[in-house]
């Protein structure tokens, strides 16, 4: 986890520990050399320095090792949103343009219909439509006890993804694939491949 905004120490010109270029997280900046200099050269390959916690390996590992930061609010990663195919759209079974409407705060999405008869789960609503529904729900003569819940932005997508039961969806898709043909079958196969990868790696 990256916990500091610093990049490089201006005195030593070495990456700051726990910063954006941290050697402990991403790997050494020089081949076969730890941060503190205790271990140098290839003979120490694979050793993790007990003093600075940096693994003695090639510096090129920095190109693919990834860290993470904790944010105040969820955001969607552009690789999974805009990539081809869009994994978020495939998992949620929602068209990419609708997913973008939610992420970019253009539309609300229904997370729970409550007692409202005209709403559907994952339905998109404009701000005006949601204001109308709110007026209806909170009217004095309203018969709605369980209020509908809507969300917007990446936080709403996070909630939709958390609501997915991947094992159950995989089972249903396998049954559906046996009775499907053509383009529909290809779409279902694409979706089950993504779900199977999540299940195989136990990703969350």
Swiss-Prot record:
Its cofactor is Zn(2+). Its EC number is 2.7.7.6. Zn(2+) binds at residues 34, 36, 49, 52. This is DNA-directed RNA polymerase subunit gamma. In cyanobacteria the RNAP catalytic core is composed of 2 alpha, 1 beta, 1 beta', 1 gamma and 1 omega subunit. When a sigma factor is associated with the core the holoenzyme is formed, which can initiate transcription. GO terms for biological process: DNA-templated transcription. Belongs to the RNA polymerase beta' chain family. RpoC1 subfamily. DNA-dependent RNA polymerase catalyzes the transcription of DNA into RNA using the four ribonucleoside triphosphates as substrates. Signal peptide: none annotated. GO terms for molecular function: DNA binding; DNA-directed RNA polymerase activity; metal ion binding. It is an enzyme of class 2 (transferase). Binds 1 Zn(2+) ion per subunit. GO terms for cellular component: DNA-directed RNA polymerase complex. The gene is rpoC1. It comes from the Bacteria. Keywords: DNA-directed RNA polymerase, Metal-binding, Nucleotidyltransferase, Transcription, Transferase, Zinc. Pfam families: RNA_pol_Rpb1_1. It catalyses: RNA(n) + a ribonucleoside 5'-triphosphate = RNA(n+1) + diphosphate.
